[in-house]
């Protein structure tokens, strides 16, 4: 066995292919009754490729990441461009899902994991944390956990305080804050 050969999960191509397979096989929209209790029509409707929708653009970012080496940029410039692409794609995913009111499905979990792995590779190319992929991935996971379980829900609560249904109602904030039980 070749000792210098990297494990398959340390290849960018693995994560790109995994994200594409997830897009093809898993629903990109949330299923109301879960993966196994949904009907075949609901399952088909939740697939990102079943109709022209925003979820196909979400997965385009990993394909663009795979095409970055074709630009033949210097190593540092390419790594920075990859990180900008990943950051822009992640921001686009969450902003567009919020604006379009799309509930994310199982394939998006794989997409976020793939984007995290690809960001890890790009940070390692830049020698962040001495290029230690484990430390970089751990730090990224901690940051993502804080964002998804603390920052995002808090922002969602504050945004809902300013809206009454679909209408902007800033006076509602004072009404909520002056409740006796708060």
Locate each region found by the language model.
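Short membrane-interfacial helix/loop motifs at transmembrane-helix boundaries
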Residues: 23-47, 146-182
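Interfacial helix-start motif at the membrane-water boundary
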Residues: 47-60
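Low-complexity, compositionally biased segments
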Residues: 5, 16, 32-35, 56
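N-terminal signal-anchor/first transmembrane alpha helix
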Residues: 2-27, 60-71, 77-94, 100-156
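A composition-driven signal for long, intrinsically disordered, charge-rich low-complexity tracts
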Residues: 32, 97-98
